[in-house]
UniProtKB/Swiss-Prot annotation:
<protein>
    <recommendedName>
        <fullName>Large ribosomal subunit protein bL35</fullName>
    </recommendedName>
</protein>
<dbReference type="Pfam" id="PF01632">
    <property type="entry name" value="Ribosomal_L35p"/>
</dbReference>
<dbReference type="GO" id="GO:0022625">
    <property type="term" value="C:cytosolic large ribosomal subunit"/>
</dbReference>
<keyword id="KW-0687">Ribonucleoprotein</keyword>
<dbReference type="GO" id="GO:0006412">
    <property type="term" value="P:translation"/>
</dbReference>
<dbReference type="InterPro" id="IPR021137">
    <property type="entry name" value="Ribosomal_bL35-like"/>
</dbReference>
<dbReference type="InterPro" id="IPR001706">
    <property type="entry name" value="Ribosomal_bL35"/>
</dbReference>
<keyword id="KW-0689">Ribosomal protein</keyword>
<comment type="similarity">
    <text>Belongs to the bacterial ribosomal protein bL35 family.</text>
</comment>
<dbReference type="GO" id="GO:0003735">
    <property type="term" value="F:structural constituent of ribosome"/>
</dbReference>
<dbReference type="InterPro" id="IPR037229">
    <property type="entry name" value="Ribosomal_bL35_sf"/>
</dbReference>
Amino acid sequence: MPKMKTKSSAKKRLKVLGGGGFKRAHAFKRHILTKKTTKNKRQLRGTSMVDATNVASVRAMMPYA
């Protein structure tokens, strides 16, 4: 059976953590930032975890992670 391919978009956007979870960046932080409040932009900093309901989909996109 041939090797499964990893989705390039997923490997660029997600990092695998030791416990089996995935780390992701926040959306809505690239452009059109003038109309967003300082509080909103501050809360979009950093990273968060992929939700448990989506972990199975992410694992299918990254079979060797």
